[in-house]
């Protein structure tokens, strides 16, 4: 059933992308929950989907499109006060999905890319370009390095902007940098489970980890491990599903999100 699993170049690429996305999303997700910006993460995912659709239409790498539009969305949200960000995120979410629908229509009708909608919105790890794994790993390492450099002031600003400002932290700049890192995280998640489901990989492991520990550093490490376990478990189950329904593979994104949900339910049950 699992013959040739680790020997497959496609599987290796999927494991690399999924693991990189999950590690960064787990860490960023804890900050996102602490800052109360889960909705902003969802909005950036939908905005980035229009970038992915545009990339398909132009025949360039979807990862570049996802990150480009996600970055613009993050910079746009960064200009707003956190209290006003939900309103801006809601408008951005609707606009992003509308643009995605239009661009996917052109991608299908003009370029004949029939599977573009499924790939952009729900992900297709096994169809990722061969070099995408290296780019995903590099992006995740860059994001984690930036988080390590900004950890203390960013954590303080996430818990209390007023206290962080009194301590001399540049709260506005930290907010913008956080949204840039969030855009990068959403980009990698969208490559794994698609734009619509990327919030599950961003918020699910983080919420689970925060149920099990209240120490931020421990929660980030746990969220990264949980996310990677869900991503790799999802890839393994999708690979195994080929023998369940011969000739057809179940979506990787389904198994990843199912693992995320199961881990959260188990954590909630254990905490009573």
Give the ranges of each region predicted by the language model.
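Membrane-interface helix termini and inter-helical loops of multi-pass transporters
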Residues: 1-7, 110-128, 237-248
């Amino acid at each position: 059933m699992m013959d040739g699993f680790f020997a497959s170049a496609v599987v290796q690429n999927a494991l690399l992308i999924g693991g990189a996305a999950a590690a960064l999303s787990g860490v960023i997700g804890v900050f996102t929950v602490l800052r109360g910006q889960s909705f902003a993460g969802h909005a950036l995912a939908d905005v980035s989907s229009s970038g992915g659709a545009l990339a398909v239409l132009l025949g360039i790498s979807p990862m570049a499109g996802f990150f480009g539009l996600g970055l613009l969305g993050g910079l746009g949200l960064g200009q707003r006060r956190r209290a006003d960000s939900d309103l801006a995120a809601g408008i951005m979410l609707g606009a992003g999905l509308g643009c995605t629908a239009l661009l996917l229509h052109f991608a299908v009708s003009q370029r004949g890319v029939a599977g573009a909608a499924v790939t952009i919105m729900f992900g297709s790890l096994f169809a990722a370009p061969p070099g995408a794994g290296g780019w995903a790993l590099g992006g995740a390492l860059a994001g984690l390095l930036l988080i390590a450099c900004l950890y203390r002031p960013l954590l303080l600003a996430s818990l209390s902007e007023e206290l962080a400002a009194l301590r001399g932290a540049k709260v506005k700049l930290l907010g913008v940098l956080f949204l840039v890192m969030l855009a990068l995280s959403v980009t990698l998640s969208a490559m794994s489970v698609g734009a619509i489901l990327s919030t599950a990989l961003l918020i699910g492991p983080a919420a689970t980890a925060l149920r099990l520990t209240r120490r931020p550093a421990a929660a980030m490490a746990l969220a990264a491990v949980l996310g990677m376990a869900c991503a790799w478990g999802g890839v393994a189950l999708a690979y195994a599903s080929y023998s369940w329904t011969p000739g057809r593979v179940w979506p990787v994104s389904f198994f990843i999100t199912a693992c995320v949900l199961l881990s959260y339910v188990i954590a909630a049950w254990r905490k009573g």
